[in-house]
Regions:
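Basic, Lys/Arg-enriched alpha-helical interface segments
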Residues: 1-65, 74-78, 85-112
Length: 112
């Protein structure tokens, strides 16, 4: 089992979800917690174009693609960095990756 943490940005997004979307995300996070680094496609995949080893947790809720950008910290904890609804957003990764990288850099600087 892997410990899963969430950043303030992820938690803010999560708290704004509908109950159905939140349940779908919790199921996906449960898979990540159980499988850790071994969680692969279709539930998780690497994000190209990042300076870090960012990954995305791929969740479907009512046919909509919800995505959670995450990474493993030096202690091998999965850190949920941010989330978003990719529905109709052709530029999702163009904004999500740079934002996640900035949050991740700050997380690493502040981590004990």
């Amino acid at each position: 089992m892997v410990e899963v943490l969430g950043t303030a940005e992820f938690e803010e997004w999560f708290l704004g979800l509908s109950s159905g979307d939140a349940r779908a995300v919790v199921r996906g996070v449960g898979l990540l917690e159980a499988k850790g680094l071994a969680l692969g496609f279709p539930h998780s995949s690497a994000l190209g174009g990042s300076r870090f080893a960012l990954r995305e947790l791929r969740v479907q809720s009512s046919g909509r693609p919800l995505r959670i950008v995450y990474a493993f910290d030096p202690q091998r904890q999965a850190v949920l960095i941010l989330g978003g609804d990719k529905t109709g957003d052709d530029r999702f990764y163009a904004w999500a990756i740079p934002k996640a990288e900035a949050i991740w850099e700050q997380y690493l600087q502040e981590a004990p």
